[in-house]
Swiss-Prot record:
It is a multi-pass membrane protein. This is Voltage-gated potassium channel regulatory subunit KCNG4. Residues 1-216, 282-292, 352-366, 460-506 are cytoplasmic. It comes from the Eukaryota. One of its GO terms (cellular component) is plasma membrane. Residues 404-415, 416-423 dip into the membrane without crossing it. It is found in: Cell membrane. GO terms for molecular function: potassium channel regulator activity; transmembrane transporter binding; voltage-gated potassium channel activity. The keyword Transmembrane helix applies. PANTHER family: POTASSIUM VOLTAGE-GATED CHANNEL SUBFAMILY G MEMBER 4, VOLTAGE-GATED POTASSIUM CHANNEL. The transmembrane segment S4 functions as a voltage-sensor and is characterized by a series of positively charged amino acids at every third position. Channel opening and closing is effected by a conformation change that affects the position and orientation of the voltage-sensor paddle formed by S3 and S4 within the membrane. A transmembrane electric field that is positive inside would push the positively charged S4 segment outwards, thereby opening the pore, while a field that is negative inside would pull the S4 segment inwards and close the pore.
Amino acid sequence: MPMSSRDRDLHPGHHHFGSCSPLSQLWPGPEPKSVKGLYYSRARKVGNQDASPEANLKEILVNVGGQRYLLPWSTLDAFPLSRLSRLRLCRSHEEITQLCDDYDEDSQEFFFDRNPSAFGVIVSFLAAGKLVLLREMCALSFREELSYWGIEETNLERCCLRKLLKKLEEAAELRREEAAQRQQQRQACHSEVQASRWARSMNQLREMVEDPQSGLPGKVFACLSVLFVATTAVSLCVSTMPDFRAEEGKGECTRKCYYIFVVESICVAWFSLEFCLRFVQAPNKCQFFRGPLNVIDILAISPYYVSLAVSDESPEAGERPSSSSYLEKVGLVLRVLRALRILYVMRLARHSLGLQTLGLTVRRCAREFGLLMLFLAVAVTLFSPLVYVAENESGRVLEFTSIPASYWWAIISMTTVGYGDMVPRSVPGQMVALSSILSGILIMAFPATSIFHTFSHSYLELKREQEQVQARLRRLQNTNSASERELLSDVDDLVPEGLTSPGRYM
C-alpha cells in the first residue's frame, strides 16, 4: 500500500522535495520504484461505454461529473475522514444523500456534481499517495474541492503547498483591502449625506486632483500637470546650453534668458497652485506633509522662490571688499537650487503606473537592496587592497595610489561599467580584476531575481486595483443613472392624465 505525503515526510527513506525547492539539488532522494498494477488495484476509471460493474461490498462506484471511478473500500481505509469513506457508514438512503447528490440503489452508484478534473487528482492521491495542484484550476477552487472531499491540504507536495499558501495570503490581503475600501466608501457615503456644500466641493476637488479617471476635470488636470512637467524639463535643458551659460557668466539677461525665466515662472505658478489645491483638499494636513510625493513637490518648488530672494539681496556698501566672495557664494547657491528643479520629473509618478510600481518595489525590496549594498561593500573591501598590493609590487606606473583610491576601481569593475581611468597593468592585478568582475556579476544577479518578481507582482497588484476602481466607478455611474430613470418614471406616474409634464402639474 503506497504511503501518503505525510507518511513519506515522516519516513527518512521516502523524503521527496518538489522541483520548486532548492534542497532538491543538495539532497537528491531516489524515486520509489513503482509496482506494476498497484494503481489499478486501488482505483480504476470506468468508461461510460463500458458495462456497469456488478455491485459488491468490496468496491465503491463513484460518478463525478459524468466520469465513473471504481475504488476498493480498502483504498479508503487510510482516509477515514474523507467523504467517500463516510459513505461506508451510512445505513439509510437519507444519510447517503446527505453526503452525495444522488444514489442509484440498483447499481450502487454514487453521483456527485463536482469538478471531475479535481476529483481525478484526488483519486490519484488516494491510490498513489501523491497530491499536487491542478495546473488549469485555481488553487483556491482546488482547496474548496479538497475541503469537500475531506482531504487535508497539508497532504499537498511541498512546492504545491507553498503555492497554495501564497495564494491564500494574496486572497486575504485582497479581502482586507476590499474591506478597507468598502469602509471608506461607507464613510464617504455617510459623510456625503450629512455634508454641507463645502464638503461636497472638497470631495469633487479631491477627485479632480487625485483621481484622473474620475471624469473629464480629472483628466484635464492630469494632462495639464504632465504638460507643465515636460515644459519645465525642456526649459531646464535649454538653460544649460553654452549661449545661456555665457550670458549668465557675464551677468547679462537677454531676451532669450527673459523668455526662459517667464516660462519657468508660469510653470512654478501652476505647480504652486496644484500644491495648494492638494493641501486644501487633504483631510489630514499632517499626513499630507509626510507623503513622499508632497515632499518632492516642496523640494522642487522652493528653489525658485529661494533663488528670487537670494538674487534680490545685494552686499551693503561697507562690505564692498568681500563682494566678490559674496557673489560667488550666491552663484553657488543659485546653481545648486537650479539643479533641484529636475525633481519636477518625479511628479510624473502621480500619473504613471510604471513609476508608482517602481516606488512600491523599492519600498518592498528595501531588505534586498540592503543585502546588495552589503555584498558590494564586502567585495569592494576585499578586492581594493588586493589590486593595490598587486600593482604596487609590479613597480610600474602607479595608478592605484592608495587603498581608498582603489575603491572607485573596485566599484566600477564589479558593476561591469569599466570607465578605463584606472587599469591594472600587471598579471596579478589583472587576475584580481577578473575575480572582481566575476564576483560582481554573481552579486548583482542574486537579488535581481527577487526584485524582478516583486516588481512584476506590484505592477499586477496596482493594475488590478486600478481596474477595480474603474469598474466601481462605472457601477456607481450606472446605479446613479438607473436611480435617475426610476425617479423620472415615478414622477411621470404622479402626473395626471390630462397633463403632459410635471411643470404643468405644478
